Amino acid sequence: MSIEKTVTLSKETIRRLLNDVKTIINTPLTDHGIYYSHDEDDIMKGYALIIGPTETPYFGGFYFFELHFPADYPHSPPLVLYCTNGDNIRFNPNLYVNGKVCISLLNTWRGEQWTSCQTISTILLNLCTLLCNNPLLNEPGITSKHTDLQKYNKIIEFKNIDVAIIQMMKKKTGVFPEKFEGFYPIMKEYFLKNKEVILSFIENKEQNQEHSECYIINIYNMNVCINWSRLLKNYKDLIKEIV
C-alpha cells in the first residue's frame, strides 16, 4: 500500500495502521464471516465484507463497510460507511440508508466510547454483532412486546435474500458497489457452498404463505410487501446464472 499521499501523517499513525492490517492478516476473522481489504493506493482507507451469521435474519447476506481513517488514528476512530443498500430498506437500527453507522465504539452513539486500544479487528467484530436476532431491540424505546418487532424481522429476512444476496450476487447497478469487486470471489464461494440451505429456507417460507403480505414499520417509514413465491423464482434463476 502506498503512503505517498500521507506525508503529513505521524509515524505513530502509519505504524499503527500497518500493525492493524498485519494483525488482521495474521489473525483473520473469517470464522466470523468477516473479510477485510486495505486500500492499496490510500493507506487511510479500508474495505470490509461481513456475511450475515446463521440463526439470524441476515443469514448469508453480504454487508459492506468502508473505513476512512483520520490523521490522528488511533486517537480518533475511523469514519465507517455502511454500503449495502437497496429498495430504501433500513436493514438495522444502527445502519442508516445514507451510510451512517451509529455505534458507541465509533463515538456516534452513547455508551462506551472509542479508545486508542481499539483496532480494525475490534471495529469489525463490533459491527458483526449488529447482525443479530431481533435487531429492532437496538432501537431506543423498543421492547420485546413492541408490535413492530416481528414484522421488522420478517422484512429483514426477506430483503436480506432479495437485496443482500440476489441483487448483490447479480451485481445490480446502484446496489452492488464496484469498489467491493475484490470480495466477489469470496461471495461466490460462500453462495455456492450455502445455496441449498438458503433455497430450502425460501421453499419452506413459500409453502407456508398463501398470499403476499405487506408490512409497515412506521418508525422507519418502511412499507414492504413480501412475496416468497416471486423470491423463490428469482433465487432459482440466480442459481442457474451462477452455477
Stretch-by-stretch model annotation:
Residues 1-4, 137-243:
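Charge-rich (especially acidic), low-complexity segments
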Residues 1-107, 111-118, 122, 239:
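Strand-helix-loop interaction patch of compact alpha/beta domains
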Residues 120-131:
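Short amphipathic C-terminal alpha-helix that caps PH/PH-like domains
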